[in-house]
Amino acid sequence: MASDLPLPLFVLLFLVLLPTPCSSWRPADDDDASVSRSVFPMDGDVAWVVQASDLHISTYNPERAAELALLGTALRAIRPHLLLVTGDITDAKNQQRTTSRQDEYEWVTYKKTIDAIVGQGGIDKSRIFDIRGNHDTYGVPYRGGKLDFFSTYSVNSQFKRLSTVSSILLQGDRSYQFLGIDDTMSVGIRFPANLFGHSTDKRIEAVNLELQYWTNRSNVPVTKVVFGHFPMSFTASSEKGQRYESVFARQSISAYLCGHLHAKVSKQLWRYHEIRTAEDHKSSFWEWELGDWKDSRLMRILAIDGGAVSFIDHTLKQALETSILVTYPTDSRSMNILDSEKWSMRNDINVLIFSHQVIRNVSARVFDSHSEFKIVEEIPLQLVASTVTHRPLYHAKWNAENYRSSSATRYWLQVFVLDSHGLKISSEQRPFSVEGKMAIPTSPWTNYLLFEVQWEDMYQVLLWSNLAFTIVLLFIPKLLYHFVRRSSSYQRWALSILSSPIQQRKAYFWLVWFLMEGTRSKPFWFSMVIYVLWLIEMPWFWGHATSENGEIAQMYLSGWSVPVHDGGLMGNKLSNPDVLVITLPFLYLVVVPVIVLIYGLFAENSIVFLRHRRRIVSSADSANMHAESSIMLPVAPRALLMKFTDKMVSMMIQFCGSWTRRALLLSCLITAAIHLKLCSKLMSAYGIVPIVLSPPLTWIPLLLLVGAAYCTVLHVD
């Protein structure tokens, strides 16, 4: 054993003890936790805002910006208190969508489009708040640089609101706080390894303090809504493992609004968070993802009515005619109650109706689902008088006691509207509970997978499961083979494996023999061990990580090591866990298959040799059989060339061999094709030359497969 294992163990020890890249650079504290505050007045205790997300304005798809005129038309009818643009403002990709870069023309288009929306929609520009998404940081080496067009063309930049935390307060009979968080990378790694939001300890603390700020200074209740680009499932923990969810629960926010995942995944990515705080108090909040403008043209109207939060989503494929948003009672399936423990029954029905037409009549009907949805009550609603010119709130009183029920979905509400053109419009039927009960529907598995699984943790599970499996696959069979290789009993056992019918041998006999025979070639086994250890600790490849013509960076399993513009430092472990889009496909689809296929080629080589050996032994006399019994399994297949030179076959037949070998070679070709496909995508993303000149990623898997296929060609009689 001493002759086989010291080298790889020494290499493993060396790589483990080697200083690994560490986070030697962080954003400046002021940038990391800076806060901007804005205060706007409102009338009464009902406020509404509009959210748009994932605009993806593109040079190659001008209709995305042009059709934002539909949003401007809608805003004229809605007249929201705020317009929130939650990230991915520009697309920042080429026409083939294979590489990323910042395009100033897209940002100029965005600025012009917003100016047009302001003129068309009649909204005060200072009430528009936009934040970065991951696409807005593709290829931005540092904030404030020449490629950081958000700092030049965004609405927030025009009002000097470039802090990572934006706090907005609407003040009326109650106070409503909207808090925006920019969790994009300070060093903008290019596509595809820029997928997650990245929180920091200082930013989380800044959010915590800011959510308390207005509460400590207000004499009226404060309802809090937080917005950002990234869902919580795609937001990484801070350096000390802190997360926003506990802060949101502790500060009793009502909802977190986000984008990022697009409507192609689902138009109902909603999640109810229940978290037990340090004081052993259970708190909760909703997380509502809004689908994209890019392909789906989605817009959300969100309202707060006395602390109750509700919303409705619209697809703006054509101009918005009339929108009906029931602000109270809220939908018992997906709407939030500010504090269910302090819930008090309200004898109100409140509805916001946004329309370009004059509204003539509004009524609400209550249906009983336990009685085949028969109408229980029809209630007329009246426009609430207001000092402001545009406050489309309709109200009615009812006896809420009549609708007490043990079921949160027994009673359903629908609103009917008649406008001045005689057009009748109705809202969607939705359940309600006057007691604040909830009936959260079961999510489809795709929604659960993307929106409720914490992908930062899932990455660690998938990554280390793969690495543990790979290390076991390399070392355990080698140890077994080392102990039994010189034993005649092993050679007899190997012969018995082949001589007995397959059905008489259990699968694990074949598996053990396959793994042990696969490790017989010392050069290949050592090469695979050193390669895997290299992937764990050393750089995989080099590339232009932060801009098309920027400095060369290195990608490790733990993230990117990128030269930082100030002080000559290195920003390390950047884009972690974002690199999962590179590492997991490579490990699962290339590295593990390469090892298994190499094992298979050498095991198949041994099978062919043993079968030929048995035929020769059976036809030889007993003396020759006794003389040759000590060399049943040759160390190198090349030795066969000297023993069986009288029956040469063509090189192609020798190379392809049996059907088993042909299947293995076909699998090698498929694995090589997958590998080359992954490499070509990375070449497009980070530069052809540096990727080609990165042997660990580009060349070693192919060389291992080609070498194993060549060395296992068996020359037999």
Model-derived features: where do they sit?
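N-terminal active-site segment of His-dependent metallophosphoesterases
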Residues: 2-10, 14-104, 477, 484, ...
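Short acidic, glycine-rich surface-loop motifs adjacent to enzyme active sites
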Residues: 211-235
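Short beta-strand elements
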Residues: 425-453
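Binuclear metal-dependent phosphoesterase catalytic core
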Residues: 265-371, 395-433
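Solvent-exposed serine/threonine-rich low-complexity stretches and specific carbohydrate-binding patches
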Residues: 372-389
